Amino acid sequence: MKKFHKCFLLVMILTVTGIITACKDSNEGVSGSGNQNLSLLTGGTGGTYYPLGGQIGKIISDKTKANITPQTSGASAENMETLRVGEAEIAFSQTDIAAYALEGKEMFDGKPIDNIQAISSLYPETVQVVTTAKSGIKSIEDLKGKKVSVGAPGSGAYINAMQILEIHGLSEKDIKGQNLSFDESAEGIQAGNIDAAFITAGTPTGAVEALSVQNDIIILPIAEDKIQALVKKYPYYAEDTIPSGTYKIKSEVKTVAVKAMLVVKKDLDEDLVYEMTKAVYDNTDQITHAKGEFITAETALEGLGDMEVHPGAAKYFKEKGVSK
């Protein structure tokens, strides 16, 4: 009988311990009171999101209770869809694509994503229409009839390509479009399989840098009147300049840019998002990527339009005296 009571007591202790542990784990997942494993969606390895995401993820992991795992992805549009279904918590995106997601426009037509908020904007993402000297292409209009990579279907680069072609009186029907990643685009130009590529990313972009090793790179300029028309119709764009020396180009190139940003699921714990935001912006000196110089608290809420900022991030920026 005593043996039975001892066994019963042991079973009860183990059962209660299991329940307490399960409750603790569950509470940590909601409240942010313990370490949390979070996924940070970036982009392809040849872009800017992936290497920069690695550095930002490390800072957050080192300074907070969040363990960040950066993941490669198809970038902005795919990232928004992944946040929609709850398979990740944080993501890089272009500001225009995040806005389209919230509004249910463009590639999200009629299917808005309402479970996301902004942490901050980060740096300019330059629209680069890349070709080489040997292609003979010197303007956007020259792309007519050419084999051109326009990015993955529904990607940020794809939307930018369609809008820029439109402003120049062209459409996808006027080119031989191919849906390639940044790396694939660079490889395609190198191999002679395509003539040009639309790439929207922070400069210098890894894939284009690799291409410039063996090729004379040309970035096609956008004329001032076309820039103004584009900005008027699509206000998330801003005029941008690629400096001479980038990819060994001899003269600066006028083009346009959107902004990169960090997006988060709106139900992520406020205190945790505050700590993550604080970790990044209090330690920007640890970001060695070329785009790190643009990441400042003072500019973190620029270019977000009507997007809501997560309360945790808003709390940090309010402490810094920064508002939209």
Residues of each region from the PLM?
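An extracytoplasmic/periplasmic, membrane-proximal ligand-sensing/linker region
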Residues: 180, 184, 190-191, 201-203, ...
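Pocket-lining segment of extracytoplasmic ligand-binding domains
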Residues: 95-97, 105-107, 114, 135, ...
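Ligand-binding clefts/hinges and TM-proximal coupling segments of bilobed small-molecule sensing domains
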Residues: 146-163, 234-306
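Bacterial N-terminal signal peptides that target proteins for export
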Residues: 1-9
